[in-house]
UniProtKB/Swiss-Prot annotation:
The UniProt record lists the keyword Metal-binding: no
GO biological process: ubiquinone biosynthetic process
Record-annotated membrane-spanning stretches: 21-39, 95-115, 118-138, 140-160, 164-184, 209-229, 233-253, 262-282
Name the record gives this protein: 4-hydroxybenzoate octaprenyltransferase
EC number of the protein: 2.5.1.39
């Protein structure tokens, strides 16, 4: 290992997981899907830019808070032992300052939308801050993560329509099951370490039912999205995308069924493609409809 000191920029990029995009991509695809549904098609460049940048920035801010909250646990977990806050390369106050700056940048983006979005951004921020501490209090902290990650859906409808209709909450609930699925896969990677240090996760709570529960969550996620959007008459592309997403879920079963660290981590890292597939089906369906109506 090189003894050359790392630059602050390098440490900050490591702190916010800049080189590991899977974490913000799983937040981004449901948010973009909600934007398209709320706008009944392309939402416009302004909102697209706000939500793409906002998702990336807030996920990065969340990493700062998470690493501060978990610093005493992370040093005992092989995967997280070298995180900047855990090693002391970035101080606690410094990490929180980075997170605060990022949160302010995200709020600046929200201010360019409307009053409803601004109002909903407050509970979104509070839940994001609360999640890292949920692992000490609840047996399924992934549900709290789901609430935090899924606020993008709520904010998308608020930004487009100025309200959050029932369909948004059905999509929110469906995506909750997706978060439970992929973050349980993630938790399975660290299960042995988490048992030793007393962290609560869905992988520990579910025990030998973990794989079955994950597959059920994938099924509920896709089923609820189909049910919520069936009245939108999105057409064949949407259902082809849902079928492709289901095929990916079955592939994940092959990756996680032996419960190996490598298999579970691989399943988590490619999960964003499942969300991307659903978004592609939705965006493609609206594009086809637009072309047909103007053809």
């Amino acid at each position: 290992m090189s003894g050359t000191p790392r630059s602050r920029l390098s440490l900050y990029l490591d702190l916010i997981r800049w080189n590991r995009p899977a974490g913000w991509l799983v937040c981004l695809w449901p948010t973009l899907s909600a934007l398209w549904v709320a706008a009944d098609g392309f939402p416009g460049w302004h909102l697209l830019l706000v939500f793409v940048l906002g998702t990336c920035i807030m996920r990065s801010a969340g990493c700062c808070v998470n690493d501060v909250a978990d610093r005493d646990f992370d040093r005992h977990v092989k995967r997280t032992a070298q995180r900047p806050v855990t090693t002391g390369a970035v101080g606690v106050k410094e990490a929180l300052a980075v997170g605060a700056v990022l949160a302010l940048l995200a709020f600046g983006l929200v201010l360019s939308t409307n009053a409803a979005t601004i109002a909903w951004s407050v509970p979104a921020l509070l839940v994001a801050i609360a999640y890292p501490y949920a692992k000490r209090l609840v047996s399924m902290p992934q549900t709290v993560l789901g609430i935090a990650f899924n606020f993008g859906i709520v904010l998308a409808f608020a930004a487009v329509q100025g309200r959050v209709p029932a369909v948004a909450w059905w999509l929110w609930l469906g995506t909750m099951f997706w978060v439970l699925a992929y973050d349980t896969e993630y938790a399975m990677v660290d299960r042995d370490d988490d048992l030793k240090i007393g962290i609560k996760t869905s992988a520990i709570t579910l025990g030998r039912l973990d794989v079955a529960a994950i597959m059920l969550c994938y099924l509920l996620f896709l089923s609820l999205w189909v049910w919520a959007l069936h009245s939108r008459a999105l057409g064949a592309l949407f259902y082809i995308a849902i079928a492709a997403a289901l095929a990916q879920a079955l592939w994940h079963w092959r990756l996680i069924r032996q419960r190996t660290r490598a298999g579970c981590f691989a399943a988590f890292r490619v999960n964003h493609w499942l969300g991307c597939t659903v978004f592609a089906g939705i965006a493609g369906s609206y594009l086809v409809r637009h072309l047909q109506s103007n053809g």
